From Swiss-Prot:
Summary of the function given for this chain in its UniProt record: Synthesizes alpha-1,4-glucan chains using ADP-glucose.
Claim: Glycosyltransferase is one of the keywords in the record: yes
Enzymatic class: transferase
Name by which UniProt lists this protein: Glycogen synthase
SUPFAM superfamilies referenced in this protein's UniProt entry, alphabetically: UDP-Glycosyltransferase/glycogen phosphorylase (SSF53756)
Top-level taxonomy: Bacteria, Thermotogati, Thermotogota, Thermotogae, Thermotogales
InterPro entries cross-referenced by the UniProt entry: Glyco_trans_1, GS/SS, Starch_synth_cat_dom
Length: 486
């Protein structure tokens, strides 16, 4: 089975969010399950910069190629590399006009950029003769590929047996643009209807992918159900319900080789489930590095997140003053909306011995927080899957979450009777319930140390690997092939 896996970001070539982790890991595990997978992504400026840092080579293999169907004179080149730690070939669509911004999700025109990349990807596939059985696209930036295949390429024998899979990592980002982009894309007018890409008189790229893909999945079973409701559907619940028989939920995994406290080169002291006492050495070193009072007994809670409303930060801001009444230090890492960046900076000014606000993106510090914290906070308003809680569990750091989406599928409330469970959480979206959940976690941390150690052990022994997920994706590909009569 040949799969072309298309993503706007892939770790370590370019990373902004969790999509990069998925796209940089799932293909490796698909390969282990016998799938012949090739990655295609844009050649962002950061790709060249990361080459030396992450030890990969990148070379040009074609240049000056025209883009079919799109009304543009822009050409593209093809570059090639190999995904580090694997033999997965990765091809890059290179164009200095569209992909020269420092930010992966920036550029002169995001609509044109996505259209150009989608169309160029299909030209790349034909130019390199990749002969895919499956084209697997991710999020709105790549969602027009199934639209192209089902319309302007419908009678092209090269793609006649190719099936499409769309993975929705976050329904909140849809790629909604003026209808004029339809002409630029070279797509037929008939797709701009209520049953196609039309969305409140605008053009919705993600909706196009939902309508035209053979099968669709999102990144947790709970989120697949949630997005068919008005509360979580982001005005697409109707079309998602129409495709419900082709809509699946597959939990993301994490790379157990990369995220392993026993071998992680970024953390201060390596440890494993049988040497948990070494974890506290990471806490002390983290406190030292961040200028917090050093005390291995004091509970440390970590928050590693984009600082945006989706992440439930309004709840945390509401209860920060109350949390400061506990023997608790809070370490924040992330960037995002100015209101949240400034809020956490002010909390650090107000509580310099209890709050460390690190308003930046720092992979090394993130690993140190996963290893050095006792508690990990994820009070998300919604969470398609979430990777932070998986990383934290892998490192024995106990998640306190809102039970929504993938958080509900991965974190199980600890039951002191059965001694089963991996964390703590709450369902109702309000600050009082968050405060209660954190308070409960702190009770076990300070007063039920045997139970706390059991929760850590449970968390670290939970199977959150990509191996499990990859098997489910292979099954999903078979369902997609069945849709095209294979």
């Amino acid at each position: 089975m040949k799969v072309v896996f298309v993503s706007y970001e892939v770790f370590p070539f370019a990373k902004v969010g969790g999509l990069a982790d998925v796209a940089g890991t799932l293909p490796k595990y698909l390969k282990k399950h016998g799938v012949d997978v090739t990655i295609v992504m844009p050649k962002h400026r950061i790709v060249e910069k990361n080459a030396e840092k992450f030890g990969y080579e990148i070379k040009k293999v074609a240049e000056g190629l025209s883009v079919s169907h799109v009304k543009t004179d822009q050409k593209f080149d093809i570059y090639e590399s190999v995904l580090p730690g694997s033999d997965v070939k990765t091809y890059f669509v290179a164009n200095d006009y569209y992909f020269s911004a420092e930010d992966v999700y920036a550029g002169p025109d995001l609509g044109e950029q996505a259209i150009f990349f989608c169309a160029a990807t299909l030209d790349l596939v034909k130019h390199l003769d990749l002969k895919p059985d499956i084209v697997h696209v991710n999020d709105w930036q790549t969602a027009l590929i199934p639209v192209y295949l089902k319309t302007v390429y419908r009678d092209d024998p090269y793609f006649s047996r190719t099936a499409t899979v769309l993975t929705i990592h976050n329904l909140g980002y849809q790629g909604v643009f003026d209808p004029k982009y339809l002409s630029f894309a070279g797509l037929p007018d008939y797709v701009f209807t209520i049953d196609g890409l039309e969305f409140y008189r605008q053009l919705n790229f993600l909706k196009g992918g939902i309508v035209f893909s053979d099968v669709i999945n999102t990144v947790s079973p709970t989120y697949a159900e949630e997005i068919q409701t008005e509360e979580y559907g982001e005005k697409l619940e109707g079309v998602l319900r129409m495709r419900s028989k082709d809509l699946y939920g597959i939990l993301n995994g994490i790379d157990y080789e990369l995220y392993n406290p026993a071998t992680d080169r970024y953390i201060y002291v390596n440890y494993d489930v049988n040497r948990l006492e070494l974890k506290w050495e990471n806490k002390v070193k983290l406190q030292e590095e961040l200028g917090l009072p050093v005390n291995k007994e004091t509970a440390v809670a970590g928050l590693i997140s984009r600082l945006v409303p989706q992440k439930g930060l309004d709840l945390l801001v509401d209860v920060m003053d109350y949390l400061m009444l506990f023997d608790l230090q809070i370490v924040v890492l992330g960037t995002g909306d100015e209101q949240y960046e400034n809020a956490f900076r002010k909390f650090q000014e107000r509580y310099p011995d209890k709050v460390s606000a690190n308003i930046k993106f720092d992979v090394e510090l993130a690993q140190k927080i996963y290893a050095g914290a006792d508690i990990f906070l994820m009070p998300s308003r919604y969470e398609p899957c979430g990777l932070g809680q998986m990383f934290s569990m892998r490192y024995g750091t106990i998640p306190v979450v809102r039970y929504t989406g993938g958080l509900a599928d991965t974190v199980k409330e600890y039951d002191p009777q059965s001694m089963e469970g991996t964390g703590f959480g709450f369902k109702k979206y309000d600050s009082a319930h968050l405060l209660k959940a954190v308070s409960k976690a702190l009770h076990f941390y300070y007063r039920e140390k045997d139970h706390w150690r059991r929760i850590m052990t449970n968390a670290m022994n939970t199977d959150l690997s990509w191996d499990r997920s990859a098997k489910e994706y292979v099954d999903l590909y078979k369902k997609a092939l069945a849709k095209v009569g294979r």
